[in-house]
Amino acid sequence: MPVQAAQWTEFLSCPICYNEFDENVHKPISLGCSHTVCKTCLNKLHRKACPFDQTAINTDIDVLPVNFALLQLVGAQVPDHQSIKLSNLGENKHYEVAKKCVEDLALYLKPLSGGKGVASLNQSALSRPMQRKLVTLVNCQLVEEEGRVRAMRAARSLGERTVTELILQHQNPQQLSANLWAAVRARGCQFLGPAMQEEALKLVLLALEDGSALSRKVLVLFVVQRLEPRFPQASKTSIGHVVQLLYRASCFKVTKRDEDSSLMQLKEEFRSYEALRREHDAQIVHIAMEAGLRISPEQWSSLLYGDLAHKSHMQSIIDKLQSPESFAKSVQELTIVLQRTGDPANLNRLRPHLELLANIDPNPDAVSPTWEQLENAMVAVKTVVHGLVDFIQNYSRKGHETPQPQPNSKYKTSMCRDLRQQGGCPRGTNCTFAHSQEELEKYRLRNKKMSATVRTFPLLNKVGVNSTVTTTAGNVISVIGSTETTGKIVASTNGISNTESSVSQLIPRGTDSAVRTLETVKKVGKVGTNAQNAGPSAESVSENKIGSPPKTPVSNAAATSAGPSNFGTELNSLPPKSSPFLTRVPVYPQHSESIQYFQDPRTQIPFEVPQYPQTGYYPPPPTVPAGVTPCVPRFVRSSNVPESSLPPASMPYADHYSTFSPRDRMNSSPYQPPPPQQYGPVPPVPSGMYAPVYDSRRIWRPAMYQRDDIIRSNSLPPMDVMHSSVYQTSLRERYNSLDGYYSVACQPPNDPRTTVPLPREPCGHLKTSCEEQLRRKPDQWTQYHTQKTPVSSTLPVATQSPTPPSPLFSVDFRSDFSESVSGAKFEEDHLSHYSPWSCGTIGSCINAIDSEPKDVIANSNAVLMDLDSGDVKRRVHLFEAQRRTKEEDPIIPFSDGPIISKWGAISRSSRTGYHTTDPVQATASQGSATKPISVSDYVPYVNAVDSRWSSYGNDATSSAHYIERDRFIVTDLSGHRKHSSTGDLLSIELQQAKSNSLLLQREANALAMQQKWNSLDEGRHLTLNLLSKEIELRNGENDYTEDTVDTKPDRDIELELSALDTDEPDGQSEQIEEILDIQLGISSQNDQLLNGTAVENGHPAQQHQKDPGKPKRQSLGEDHVILEEQKPILPVTSCFSQPRPMSISSASCLPITTSVSVGNLILKTHVMSEDKNDFLKPIANGKMVNS
């Protein structure tokens, strides 16, 4: 059995006895086959043959000279004259010169021969391939003929490698890989990367290793199908190029077929992965050589395998591919390179020596060289190697460049094992392990510094940014982008907000802390720059005695939580005064998986603001104290979808109403019907939760768009949400995939992202919450309430009443509708407000309001109170959206912002703007021009009353969930714009009145709700008939129908969606009649300030006469709605009640059909006091004027 040969790096020890060579006992003696053993082991051989390859030893063992080239590396002294005698003196002379050259070259191996465990200070200047070839040369026995042949071949190989090294020194490594893959692609082949290429080759082997013959198409499809789960980017084209690479390498045996594709069978010698991979690699190396590229084995290993462990493998491939002509070609290439660079190191002097080495025959059976040829070859190789070392040390731009470690890399952070165990490292300077303790500590320290300097959040610790920090009770400071203290609020138990502390309790919302923080700072900075529009002082909001929900939850890094109403009070969200931040900062880095916290406005805030330490991380979620109901996130966003993934810009909206019959649709819609919903239903969400923005099964998430003048907050206004019992099961599950952030109710589920269906109650059990809902409507639109009037930002809203939250409605304001906290204007074509109380088929949600284009205000939910008596009068909901003229519309259809159409702001994702149970098609094509739409345009789509209006909860398509909540009052406000400047007076009066009437309001609300339900079904028919009679009498007396022909016929009807919540005592009924008299009488005077005429596109409508035989009541009660002419039949329900025995129930009454016109609903507001000159009127721009 031949002995296993040692590794080439262990050339300083005997491969048989493993003893290190020395000059006494274990003298190194090289054999003709280039194996070197110690003299002791050589004398013990039984036969004169090499123990490794069984080559015969022709010369006497005692005559073979000692290899002093190796002895000098272990510290032995080389004698000047060696006692060796050849046939003649000339041979001895040539031998001495050649031996001296080899011994000189061996000195370059000195770093590999340091003492055991001791690192050598002088690192080798030669690369690892050069060192390996030099070891081969040093081990040659020049005395024997076989040894001289091997020495000549080793000299040639060393010279060829020298040329390659010199070319590599002049080559740009950045362009190397690009040039290589360009050459590979030019031949119809492709390399897919180390991991993917390896997997593809293994799959090809799996398909063909049994000798089966497949067509190229079938083979490619098989590989692609198996690759797709791990590599989704795999395609038939790319895999076909990989197969073509193997085809070029002659790995297949091809069988041609007539009029059919050829069959490919893997050759037997390539039916193992190692053989197939070697041939594959050899083909790529061959392509590189054809392209004239010089690539080192290290680079090959890195390119093809992604590591440095395959250098020897690649070197052997390179060596095998070398042809006798390749050396000469390399010399020519080097000459051209030197001409281009100017040759500062005078490398042209090496050209004769290189040409001499190139002329050596590399064949193993070549003729034995003469002694003179041996001497010349050794001198030539010594010269060129010296020239290479000199160039690397003195002229190379890459010479001894220290590799730059990446953060957290393992580069030189542990000691070299070869150095410890063998006493020397063959890798030299290229070793990725440390060779000394100083080097080890140096790189470990550098690694720590690089890790510490990685910035996770670029805006921390700058002016105006307050980071989050944990306090003792789990409270977290909000990220506020203001340069000054914006205001300090303390929530007290009596509902008063003081300015003492600015710490707010935060709750987690989704993930991506750094992304969310940067986004929040950006939005708050934008809000801060617009804060001057809100009033003289941004801190004026904190003067409110009534806690109001934040105007814009996410913009102030504070999202209201739908928590228990008895847990603390609501807090004011203060708009920052100013902000120094630019809003053009990129908002969305690619990934981060932390948690961002947002304010919970219902929690006590007793702590001062500490500063945030400079770390890049956020504290854990705040702990919930014992005995307190925990608040779940109000706005939940899934984190398993990449933020930057966008749907196609032209992606059609999903149709959530595909199950309805065609008669329920607006069949004359100018838009194409959307395709069917492509995602299945999502499991039901918890009670009060909005349908999610996207399904977590989708592969993209709707992105937030950035504009110059408006920051889209992608959040909903803080509002109370609808109980799950209102929805029927099928409808609820159908709408769970609608777009928009969804709210989570007070009940904390196990996981904020998991949907927990709650028990559904029958509709008849909702009666205790109807009055509460009507009382809390103002709270839900506070975010869109204050825009231009300085005092309007401080308008009060009704505080939370002790009754439970109302489950009566849910409004989905899409993320397209966003406003800043104070003063940010709409800068896009303004969308219509979708009202939850609308009738599904009429679409009072489709209103488009024509008003002053730039005077944009959205006031809502003003609590109107009597200045004298303190009794609560009414709440008038003024929903208004402004529409710019078409020439002022800056919207580009395919810009990065949302598309604005007559249906509102249309985002780039599949969304439905509002929750309704009727099939209203509210989609728009991108880029469609914004066109005003009047309600009368849609009158033909209102069908006659059918079975859908017959009962409250039997039909799944019934809109009674919404239409029974309130009446809609529509007023022609064409002449009101000129009086909009007087709205400030009323706002001031409202602010002064709120403190006197707060307690009375709560008491009246509580009393009204107790008495309301006693008259569940009484008098609803009588009230409606009485209402019609009273209206006709008022209209006949005042003749105000003749005063309203001043509007243009083509003018849009401006719709004011208003709901009157009437909770007044019995003594107010006579005053209400007086109020109507005042309003109807003055309407024809003050410049038509309140035109009571029913108008359809600017023309007065004919009045509809009711049957005079119906019973009549003595007062209007609280139904202040004028129901007038209607061409089609429109269902209207009586929704207002009064705490009297004959009042009307709002939650349990059946729908009542009457003849009204959708365009002719007139809003009659009531007087604030007994004075006839002091009453409120809705104005076109959303302000309220005190006449």
From Swiss-Prot:
Residues passing through the membrane, by range: none
Sorted keywords for this record are: Cytoplasm, Metal-binding, Phosphoprotein, Repressor, RNA-binding, Transferase, Ubl conjugation pathway, Zinc, Zinc-finger
Which domain of life does this protein belong to?
Eukaryota
EC number(s) on record? 2.3.2.27
What pathway or pathways are given for this protein in its record?
Protein modification; protein ubiquitination
Q: Which residues carry this modification: Phosphoserine?
A: 548, 806, 981, 1115
Region feature (ROQ):
171-325
**InterPro entries reported in the protein's UniProt record:** ROQ_II (IPR041523), Roquin_1_2-like_ROQ (IPR048575), Roquin_domain (IPR052249), Znf_CCCH (IPR000571), Znf_CCCH_sf (IPR036855), Znf_RING (IPR001841), Znf_RING/FYVE/PHD (IPR013083), Znf_RING_CS (IPR017907)
Region (Disordered), start-end ranges: 527-571, 640-677
Q: Where is this region: HEPN-C?
A: 326-396
C3H1-type Zn finger ranges:
410-438
Q: Which reaction does it catalyse?
A: S-ubiquitinyl-[E2 ubiquitin-conjugating enzyme]-L-cysteine + [acceptor protein]-L-lysine = [E2 ubiquitin-conjugating enzyme]-L-cysteine + N(6)-ubiquitinyl-[acceptor protein]-L-lysine
**Would the keyword Glycosyltransferase be found if you checked this record's keyword annotation?**
no
- Predominantly, its location class is cytoplasm
| Site feature location: Cleavage | 509
From the Swiss-Prot or TrEMBL record, give the protein name.
Roquin-2
Lineage of origin:
Eukaryota, Metazoa, Chordata, Craniata, Vertebrata
Encoding gene, per UniProt annotation: Rc3h2
